[in-house]
């Protein structure tokens, strides 16, 4: 019990596999913690490729600057062949037709939310223009996106 402190709240999001199917094999990751001693435990989690495929899908259906930032950040960390293998199903499941021009048309909406959404999460937040242009070039280079 912690009588002097507010209760600890933990949010757990359980999504049905029929709504958000995992298409790529999960990976096992060691739990990193700030305490001394070896915990020696790992957890099963989404692969970076699954996360990247989800981020690419979601950027075409919602306007959250975090998705653009994450896509640009994950580019060098993911196997794009695996990402591209999952994308057609990711789009189809949600009924999304990825349209790069429509994404560019939402530029001002992304820009308006950039600082308020991210500056409290990312210490050295890069400029919106730089990240947005990099993201558009990257996505425009993918064969699946028109």
Region locations from a protein language model:
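Structured mid-to-C-terminal alpha-helical surface segments
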Residues: 1-146
């Amino acid at each position: 019990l912690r009588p002097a402190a507010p209760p600890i709240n933990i949010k757990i999001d359980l999504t049905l596999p029929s709504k958000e199917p995992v298409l790529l094999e999960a990976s096992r990751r060691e739990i990193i913690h700030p305490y001394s001693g070896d915990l020696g435990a790992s957890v099963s989690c989404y692969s970076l490729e699954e996360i990247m495929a989800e981020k690419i899908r979601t950027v075409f259906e919602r306007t959250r600057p975090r998705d653009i930032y994450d896509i640009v950040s994950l580019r060098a960390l993911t196997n794009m062949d695996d990402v591209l293998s999952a994308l057609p199903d990711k789009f189809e499941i949600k009924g999304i037709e990825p349209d790069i021009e429509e994404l560019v048309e939402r530029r001002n909406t992304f820009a308006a939310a950039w600082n308020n959404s991210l500056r409290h999460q990312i210490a050295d937040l890069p400029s919106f223009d730089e990240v947005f242009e990099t993201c558009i070039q990257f996505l425009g280079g993918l064969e699946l996106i028109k």
